[in-house]
Curated annotation (Swiss-Prot):
Residues 136-139 are annotated as: G4. This is Elongation factor Tu. Its EC number is 3.6.5.3. Residues 19-26 are annotated as: G1. Residues 60-64 are annotated as: G2.
Amino acid sequence: MARAKFERNKPHLNIGTIGHVDHGKTTLTAAITMTLAALGQATAKGYDQIDNAPEEKARGITINTAHVEYETENRHYAHVDCPGHADYVKNMITGAAQMDGGILVVAATDGPMPQTREHILLAKQVGVPSLVVFLNKEDLMDDPELLELVELELRELLSSYDFPGDDIPIIKGSGLQALEAMTKNPKTKKGENPWVDKIYELMDAVDSFIPTPERDVDKPFLMAVEDVFTITGRGTVATGRIERGKVKVGDTVELIGLKDTRTTAVTGIEMFKKSLEEGLAGDNAGVLLRGLKKEDIERGMVIAKPGSITPHTQFEGEVYVLTEKEGGRKTPFFAGYRPQFYVRTTDVTGTIKAYTSDEGKEVEMVMPGDRIKMTVELINAIAIEQGMRFAIREGGRTIGAGVVSKIIK
């Protein structure tokens, strides 16, 4: 029988498993759901159910992602797991599954591998705030000294990407042993099996170490303008979805991007043709602005709390370039390439000045399917901030997806 909707009386977090191929991410995900299902806090999902992840589209890109949900004593979690490495890259860059924290899975038998590094780097670039490590396949390691060396290497690696390597909890265990114990006896509780206890230990670490994210509604107000029209006798209305924060009638706001920043006041808020006193994050609303004409506002501007976001023209972005099969380009491109950058609600033309590899070396040519860091200069200043997502388009089709990793100017 389908379970009723989770009660939202606990803080909600989005997390995911990341790490090198075959290090045990999906097995661990299955073990977590089965362990917590014994407490009635999850629906048990087998390996196959998670591995056969459905396709989704995010910003015009197809990604395979498995979603499971579960709760601990303290929190409710939505957990994403991706079957393939390319899916992880796409997922993290498009923000299709925004992560408040990650469980980095590393096989103790291998130690950190190339994708381990790549996922840590990506987590840093796209702004995953916090990681916890599960050192998997402990059952296959006879030498405790070797296990300790792998842990030290991991802590150094995390520190080298500016994560707090010395403080990050590293839980050793075996996803497979825990999964097998739970499959044999689905009612296994804490204290009844050492491998299952490791899963509880991991979830305790996730509960205590990964901070609760600030709710969207508590952040400074921002709404991207989608449309503008005039109401005779009342003034100019900008419509859009409130991305974060809240706005009240009488609030002072700034209009940012494409033209000089202007300060104005909110004289009314409408939703579904009704007047409201306040608009909240997630609402599709119309905001009436004092003293502005229709031509003062255009799609692509943002209305925001004064001083909370500023217009910029130059930034660095971490980008995934679509393959031809994904609907992207057939041919490579070079420095000086001028596509459109689709940010929030509008396309802005920009020139790509340079490309940089993970090692910090300059790259001449970018191929479809590459992940690359690029330096971009837009022809118009728009409201940009670190961690913001964008698409790269050419003649209306998406050829890449990116996230702003650094503001230059």
